[in-house]
């Protein structure tokens, strides 16, 4: 590959990055030598049985990647086309999925425009569903599997970013006071309390493989048939 022209590499990169789920197409490649099994298959068979894991996703991961200036409007036909291509679903299934997510967001008092719907479906396809599948496979062998969903919303772009990709990082690492961070992560007592609860959870997990602490209470592990998930947002709640 080092002998290929840069333009040709970039052309291939652009083709792969415009993957079906809109989030890029790069991933592990099973070659039978360096990577004998696909990661999810290996975890499902117990390759990580000795490793406790604390993992999670943000509610609106895709909104950060889709936050382009002057984002083009998305009408109903374009929404159906994008979702159908993303999920490889027929028209009836596509319509049901779109309605399901639109209704769910509205029920939770979240914006439910066509852009919001395609964003949440991209988030599910690219982040949350793969994460949940990993947790399902790992929890078969490792009882200390802990899952979270981050729902704190960014004030940036008049709130259009929602709980986007990377927004959890300043809370986990305690950098809310970094220059200009308040524009992205917010500020105030609620933000500080959330950061404290998340940092204490990560510290507790690092110390004894259990993220429970007085600020959030008992954090029960994730199980395939009891999908315990800690919600980190305006309040911390195990669901």
Predicted regions mapped to residue ranges:
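Proline-rich low-complexity regions
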Residues: 28, 52, 70-71, 88, ...
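Mobile gating loops/cap/lid regions near enzyme active sites that modulate substrate access
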Residues: 10, 14, 120, 128-239
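Short coil/turn segments at secondary-structure boundaries
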Residues: 13-15, 24-28, 95-101, 110-115, ...
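Short amphipathic alpha-helical surface patches that mediate protein-protein
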Residues: 2-6, 102, 153
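C-terminal, loop-rich substrate-recognition/catalytic regions characterized by aromatic stacking residues
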Residues: 48-104, 154, 170-173, 189, ...
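Short glycine/proline-rich turn/loop motifs
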Residues: 97-117, 175-186
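Substrate-access "cap/lid" subdomains that shape
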Residues: 1-84, 115-140
